[in-house]
């Protein structure tokens, strides 16, 4: 008698199939690595897909220079332990402008350092397929995105011009200059991600676990004081309001644009229990998602992840 796969094993098998399919179909794929929990799961699945061999493609981190310090330390640790072929790209135009989320705002900062930075890297290395860790349950525009998300020669996404995906059949044919973004975790939920991390004991950035951290409330968002740069952009009143609180992060990005949540969950089982009870989206803490109605879809149309 054949044992039935659990839903996590079914999701795992589906994701591994997608990763292998892309590696077979495309000439120069790359895996985007944002250092977050979804990237950790996607990287784990990719290593499983080609074990005992090495990944047949590099991993790409589009750096904004404003990630949490713990994320940078974790990235270097993973590269060292796993022997990853890591490419790091920072938009030189953004560096020249001293781009930051305080002076230029979240929308401009994200466009220059993330969207344009990603497009530069994809063009520079000639990648024709890029794996991303987005899931359909995260946000409305992502809910309607295909597993194979086709982009034109300028990396733009047209939601009205996407191919049908029947069962596990994917059409990877692209014209010269076109590319695709591939989302192997499309059908996973946030709870699935955490349960799989627990099941597989996947290492993740410690920021996901609750700890006493210095925070300041900015426009209703609890922002962690990660380094001294932020202090020069705070008013005297805001500096005076800095305090310590038990918080953790459900999602990670540029630290001034990522809100912490009050929590006492210090272990994976406690995080899973918290996920079973929560009724809010993990991306409620992402400032860039609140720029304007439909802002995420517009970002994706311009070439965002």
Curated annotation (Swiss-Prot):
Q: Keywords in alphabetical order, please.
A: ATP-binding, Nucleotide-binding, Nucleotidyltransferase, Transferase
UniProt-listed InterPro entries: PAPS_reduct_dom (IPR002500), Rossmann-like_a/b/a_fold (IPR014729), SO4_adenylTrfase_ssu (IPR011784), Sulfate_adenylyltrnsfr_sub2 (IPR050128)
Q: Which CDD domains match?
A: Sulfate_adenylyltransferase_2 (cd23946)
Q: Would you kindly state one Gene Ontology biological process term found in this protein's UniProt entry?
A: sulfate assimilation
Catalytic reactions of this protein: sulfate + ATP + H(+) = adenosine 5'-phosphosulfate + diphosphate
Pathway, per UniProt? Sulfur metabolism; hydrogen sulfide biosynthesis; sulfite from sulfate: step 1/3
Q: What is its EC number?
A: 2.7.7.4
Q: Which family does it belong to?
A: Belongs to the PAPS reductase family. CysD subfamily.
Q: Summarize the subunit comment.
A: Heterodimer composed of CysD, the smaller subunit, and CysN.
Please describe what this protein does.
With CysN forms the ATP sulfurylase (ATPS) that catalyzes the adenylation of sulfate producing adenosine 5'-phosphosulfate (APS) and diphosphate, the first enzymatic step in sulfur assimilation pathway. APS synthesis involves the formation of a high-energy phosphoric-sulfuric acid anhydride bond driven by GTP hydrolysis by CysN coupled to ATP hydrolysis by CysD.
| Protein name stated in the entry | Sulfate adenylyltransferase subunit 2
Q: Which organism is it from?
A: Stutzerimonas stutzeri (strain A1501)
The taxonomic lineage of its organism, from the top, reads: Bacteria, Pseudomonadati, Pseudomonadota, Gammaproteobacteria, Pseudomonadales
């Amino acid at each position: 008698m054949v044992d039935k796969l659990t839903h996590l094993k079914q999701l795992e098998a589906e994701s591994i199939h997608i990763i292998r399919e892309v590696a077979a179909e495309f000439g120069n794929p790359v895996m985007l690595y944002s250092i977050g929990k979804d990237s950790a799961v996607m990287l784990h699945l990719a290593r499983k897909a080609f074990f005992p061999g090495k990944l047949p493609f590099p991993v790409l981190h589009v750096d904004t220079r404003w990630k949490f310090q713990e994320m940078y330390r974790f990235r270097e640790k993973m590269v060292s332990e796993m022997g990853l072929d890591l490419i790091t790209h920072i938009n030189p135009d953004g560096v020249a402008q001293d781009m930051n989320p305080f002076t230029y705002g979240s929308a401009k900062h994200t466009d220059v350092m993330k969207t344009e930075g990603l497009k530069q890297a994809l063009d520079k290395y000639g990648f024709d397929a890029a794996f991303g860790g987005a899931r359909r349950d995260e946000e409305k525009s992502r809910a309607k995105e295909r597993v194979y998300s086709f982009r034109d020669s300028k990396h733009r996404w047209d939601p009205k011009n996407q191919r049908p995906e029947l069962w596990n059949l994917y059409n990877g044919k692209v014209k010269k200059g076109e590319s695709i973004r591939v989302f192997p975790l499309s059908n996973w939920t946030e709870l699935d991600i955490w349960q799989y991390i627990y099941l597989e004991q996947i290492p993740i950035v410690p920021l996901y676990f609750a700890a006493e951290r210095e925070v300041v409330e900015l426009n209703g968002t609890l922002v962690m004081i990660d380094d001294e740069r932020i202090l020069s952009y705070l008013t005297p009143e805001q500096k005076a309001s800095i305090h310590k609180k038990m918080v953790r992060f459900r999602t990670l990005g540029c630290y001034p644009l990522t809100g912490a949540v009050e929590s006492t969950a210090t272990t994976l089982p406690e995080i899973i229990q918290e996920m079973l009870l929560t009724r809010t989206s993990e991306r409620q803490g992402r400032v860039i998602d609140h720029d304007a109605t439909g802002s995420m879809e517009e970002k994706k149309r311009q070439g965002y992840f």
